[in-house]
């Protein structure tokens, strides 16, 4: 028996529940956002340019600076200034530069101008369709990132998902979450073509998610926002 089949079963169940064509499970919504942003940013780079951004804090100027190769620009990704701390950090780790806006949001918000949505505080049926209707460019290409942390609606140990509609992105995301590896192929037999991260969902977490999803109501209200600080005032993120 393949122990990772339960992860695929969980992904299929979440896709049905939310109305998403594809679902990629990872170990947190933070990781989901990072991978979704990374996918879109690398698609926006000129052919042949692949860069890594290194962020350093200059104690003299009191500013954070990005050091990148090949003079590649840092793409700005705009988010509400009051959200969870890991969101701008995910943007940085993905190679972008976070900027902030004033927005009173509930349930989900867009990481502008990317078609990426942070829905850590809302998990309900037809979630993917809801995000698509809110997206100014139309529903195509939306990536909705969910959280299944024990404090959230589904309430398993940890975990998150990327809901999307792109078969090319699906293959990339599955390798990206698993150290660049191909699912089901031993490292010695694999042909590694991309640098990945180590953020896949473990089978035991997926199994718990399947059980809880079976009993989850169809319609769930957004969770209230925490008392988030103003992230635009953090020097490390400026």
Question: Where is each model-derived feature located?
Answer:
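Long, low-complexity intrinsically disordered regions
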Residues: 136-138
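Conserved N-terminal alpha-helix of the aminotransferase class I/II PLP-enzyme fold
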Residues: 1-31, 39, 223-238
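Short alpha-helical
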Residues: 31, 85-86, 168
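Conserved SAM-binding loop
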Residues: 25, 79-80, 162
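Buried hydrophobic packing segments
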Residues: 32-40, 160, 209
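Active-site region of PLP-dependent enzymes
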Residues: 123-129, 140-238
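PLP-dependent aminotransferase-like
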Residues: 38, 42-126
């Amino acid at each position: 028996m393949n122990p990772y089949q339960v992860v695929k079963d969980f992904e299929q169940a979440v896709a049905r529940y939310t109305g998403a064509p594809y679902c990629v499970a990872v170990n947190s919504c933070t990781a989901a956002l990072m991978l979704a942003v990374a996918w879109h940013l690398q698609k926006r780079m000129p052919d042949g340019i692949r860069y890594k951004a290194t962020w350093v804090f200059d104690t003299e100027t009191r500013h954070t600076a990005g050091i990148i190769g090949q003079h590649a620009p840092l793409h700005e990704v705009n988010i509400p200034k009051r959200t969870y701390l890991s969101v701008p950090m995910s943007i940085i780790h993905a190679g972008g530069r976070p900027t902030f806006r004033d927005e009173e949001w509930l349930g989900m918000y867009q990481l502008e101008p990317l078609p990426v949505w942070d829905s850590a505080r809302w998990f309900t049926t037809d979630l993917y369709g809801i995000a698509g209707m809110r997206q100014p460019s139309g529903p195509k290409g939306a990536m909705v990132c969910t959280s299944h942390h024990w404090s959230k609606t589904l309430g398993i140990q940890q975990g998150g998902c990327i809901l999307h509609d792109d078969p090319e992105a699906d293959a990339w995301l599955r390798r990206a979450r698993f150290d660049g590896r191909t699912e089901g192929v031993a490292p010695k037999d694999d042909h590694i073509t991309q640098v990945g991260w180590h953020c896949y969902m473990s089978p035991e977490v997926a199994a718990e998610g399947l059980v809880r999803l079976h009993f989850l109501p169809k319609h769930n209200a957004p969770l209230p926002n925490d008392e988030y600080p103003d992230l635009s005032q953090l020097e490390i993120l400026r």
